[in-house]
């Protein structure tokens, strides 16, 4: 059973890596800067886009929080306390919720989002068709 949990976690981690690399390429930020965070608008935008599309292709807030915490720690097998994961997951949810406002505020953000959406459709066609949610509207 533990092997199947590790296998699923590795798949989610691989999805995370592929999508985050693409977002970083589109937003012109470094992956380590996105992981560790920054107040630069380009990094904030990249984080919002990453969370938005990771959620759309099936990762939960907890999945994203755990992967980020493990990447910061440098150990993909580390199991942090659940309270810390849940606290980080709340921040992930705030980023997910801020997507609509960023689209309203920035045409460039919409263009970047469109490029990532096209990438997801191509890269994760099966998952995209089964898990893609509607764009949030306000």
Regions from the language model: what does each represent?
Residues 1-138:
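Basic, alpha-helical nucleic-acid-binding regions used in initiation and control of genome expression
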């Amino acid at each position: 059973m533990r092997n199947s949990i590790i296998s699923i976690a590795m798949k989610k981690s691989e999805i995370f890596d592929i999508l985050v690399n693409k977002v970083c390429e589109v937003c012109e930020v470094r992956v380590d800067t996105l992981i560790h965070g920054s107040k630069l608008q380009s990094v904030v935008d990249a984080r919002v886009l990453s969370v938005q599309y990771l959620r759309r292709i099936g990762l939960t807030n907890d999945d994203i929080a755990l992967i980020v915490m493990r990447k910061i720690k440098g150990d993909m097998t580390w199991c942090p306390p659940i309270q810390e994961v849940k606290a980080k997951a709340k921040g992930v949810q705030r980023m997910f919720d801020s997507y609509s406002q960023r689209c309203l505020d920035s045409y460039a953000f919409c263009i970047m989002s469109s490029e990532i959406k096209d990438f997801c459709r191509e890269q994760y066609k099966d998952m995209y068709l089964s898990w893609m949610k509607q764009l949030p509207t306000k």
